[in-house]
A protein has these predicted regions:
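Phosphate-handling DNA/RNA-contact segment within nucleic-acid enzymes
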Residues: 1-87
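TOPRIM fold recognition
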Residues: 44, 56-161
Length: 161
């Protein structure tokens, strides 16, 4: 894959290999749902991460009680929310990567997360992790710095009204 495209937001783009078109419909998939479905149903909650790696890291921490699934990007939609609600989910926590690097981008990113969650608040209770203290590096996932850091951020998450 072209490094320029990866560095500039193209890593989730469809690929053409020997004239064949390959794509993965991200808007219809939650990575890790097949493994974490029982824990999600038992706890009535799902934690949405951006990347598959986050779901795998959480699996190492929580094992059979892991409720983390990945949206494979920084968006989710009504289809995915309804899929979780059908499993009995009442609480959805968005745990996306830290994408703010200054006060202006912090406000923009906060508003983006808040409005994404608010859009679907009639389906479930929504909250999101937002690192106001810059504990995480820029573009780092809440799972990248260990379970203690994740749980600290989780306990300080923003609840959407």
């Amino acid at each position: 894959m072209d490094e320029y495209k990866i560095d500039h937001g193209g890593k989730y783009m469809p690929a053409y290999i020997q004239g064949e078109f390959y794509t993965h419909p991200l808007m219809y998939n939650l990575y890790g749902l097949n493994f974490n479905k029982q824990a999600i149903q038992k706890n009535h909650l799902a934690i949405l991460a951006e990347g598959e790696k986050s779901s795998l890291i959480a699996d190492g921490w929580y094992g059979d009680n892991n409720c983390v699934v990945a949206t494979c990007g920084d968006k989710f939609n009504k289809f995915l929310v309804k899929q979780l609600v059908k499993l009995g989910v009442t609480d959805i926590i968005v745990a996306y990567d830290r994408m703010n690097h200054d006060k202006i981008s912090q406000k923009v990113y906060f508003n983006k997360l808040y409005s994404m969650c608010q859009k679907y608040k009639n389906y479930a209770n929504f909250s999101f992790i937002f690192d106001t203290d810059e504990i995480l590096e820029y573009k780092a996932a809440p799972f990248d710095s260990g379970v203690e850091t994740f749980e600290k951020l989780f306990n300080r998450r923003v609840f959407v009204k």
